[in-house]
Amino acid sequence: MKYILLLLMSLVLTLVNAQDCHFIIQGKVIDQHDGKPLEGAIVAIYGLQKEVFSDKNGQFILQGLCQGFYEIEISHIDCGTQFIPIKLEKNTSKTFYLEHHVEALNEVALIKKATNLIVQQTIDATVFENKLSQNFAEALTEIQGINTLKTGNAIAKPLLQGVYGSRVITNNQGVRMQDMEWGAEHAPNIATSSVEGVSLAVGAKALKYGGDAVGGVIVLDPRKPVFKNSQKHSAIFTTYTNGLGVLSSQKFEKDFENGLFYGIQASYKKAGNNRNAAGYLQNTGLEQTSISIPFGWHLAHKGIDAYISYFKANNGILRNSHIGNLQDLINQINRETAIPIGAFTYNIENPRQDVSHVLAKISAYYHFEDLGKWTLQYDFQQNNRKEYDVRLGDRNKLPGTDLQLQTHGFQSNFKLDTSYDKLIEFGIETAYQIHFPNPATGVKRLIPDYNNLNFGTYLYGLKTLSPSWELEGSIRTDWVQIKADKFYKTSRWTALGYNTDFSDFIVSDFDTQILTAPELSFNTQSAAFSLHYNNLGHRVSTHLQYIERAPNPAELFSEGLHHSAARIELGSLRMKKEKAQKLAVQYSYSAAQRTFFIAPYFNRINDYMALIPAGLEFTIRGAFPVWEYQQTNANFTGIDFKWTEYFTDELKFTNGASIVKALDLKNNSPFPNIPPVSTHHELSQSFKHIKGLSVQLRGDYNFRQNEVPEDLLIFNPYTQREQLLEINRAPNGYFL
């Protein structure tokens, strides 16, 4: 495959012969709503240093052009940007229509490229520079509707409209992240300092990134070349008080006018024990290292680019979370706050996580005249996760969990974008995964050896119905095949009835254990439609989607102690695919003095795969809660809100809130790990004459989550009586 890919790339990048360069492109730029000319619009040729401004009559002229194919970029300060392909064989006259509206910085953005309009919420690199003390998931909460599921000082996952893990896709530099996202304690392997910008994709277009994005898609924007000889270097040093954390980040970028570009970004972050009001929390330090290198060559109608990144994190886990006997477990879970132990130190000991992630990709594109743009991409990822528990003797140096996941991905898509009022895009993608759990740990493997093959294809279309109305639609189908090798205890295999339902999976019977080779296949179909209305700063988008999600390996095969979670997790071979039906409405208003955004949603998920507390298990290593993957029907209902008032060009006030309710319909009970009602308020003052200087005063309040499942009533052999294990109880509301 790699030789075919290299051959295609070499064909894509073959240079064209020199031509006579005396042609012109002239025309007008018109306001799409009222037909009036737009003055000051930038008309440029993508990939070349040719750009002009439209005059007061909206007219422009580009001169000295060769015969050939060009992509014309038209933009205006108050409008979205368009990219229009043109085949130039003679002097050409064109009229371009721009949708004139006031955009609010870092709020709901209307992004238009080749008439591809999709509602997204965005944050740029400047926002992330102010969030360097936080991890990636925490920084994402600047986007309304994203909360976090936080299980440690440096361990947090994005939680979108009540769902997380495999239901929220993270697309990094055009690559879907494969970093064992199924674990609640598995944070995204992305350094906050490496992010150029992030957008949240919802609606029909989001199906391009995957058919299982029940919550949505978090898209990390790739670096864009500037097509001129330039270089830029930036250095950031940040420190923060809790944990005496420090972070250093360096970035260098180099661009050439011929479209070549390259860069390098590196960062290092270290913090010691955090503290609460009573004292230091032992073993809550962290250490992170990241480096990324983008490079490539972009022209107007063809290009190639590559990206390589490495991320490594050593995250301490609160020492108190290491459980001994049952009474220890009850005391720790029922306690209001963790008991501080020890003094401040940067040392990180067991229990801890040691995680690394490598990502590499190469992609190429070619724009065919009068047809569209074809893109090919290959990517590789390797994720290593080691989880260390407190063990005796030399075994303390060995991880209790040692997992490696390799992913090879290939994708191809074609975008038919020669028409102004419609767009069609289709593509295929495939991924092959090899999962290896190292048996040298001496501990039963939580997730077995498996190979996972995914194949997906999608079709997307957009139609401009009128200057104010647009319709999007997409369909997608995916096929998933998982082949595993796993040992089961004979007693458990029989108790679950697997000996009857899955007898063909048995390879060998070793009396007390059974070696099996499960082979499971799932075919999923997804569809989504989005209708957009936009006029005079008001925008309403309605999204209707049906999504099927195949179970992930953890939901199927988990069996054993998940060390970083300090619990036993059990999967089920009987898992069926989820079926989610979602209706979401987004309304936004943008004006010079204020912006407003509100988004109610309802998501009905049949056969929802939930990890539920189910009891306790006593082992030679102590007592641990048992959590089981179970299927039920679920309703997720919520609303996200954000309002910003601009008092002056430099002073603004922002208020936001998120509410989500989740109900287990079969058991008429709430789900665990659902975020409470949260609000935030921020007063921000920038200084026009001092570039880069701003002051923010922010407060966040999280209410107490009262809608939780019932706690477990267990028998305590030490006291010889039943005792309540408050495993689902939520903390009181708090203000930060």
Question: Where are the predicted features?
Answer:
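Outer-membrane beta-barrel signature, preferentially recognizing the C-terminal barrel domain
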Residues: E336-L359, F502-N534, V540, Y546-I605, ...
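Transmembrane beta-barrel wall of Gram-negative outer-membrane proteins
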Residues: I24, G243-K270, Y280-N320, R352-G372, ...
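Flexible loop and strand-edge segments within Gram-negative outer membrane beta-barrel domains
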Residues: A271, A277, Q282-T284, K302-I362, ...
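Short acidic/polar hinge/loop motifs at secondary-structure boundaries
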Residues: E138, V175-G203
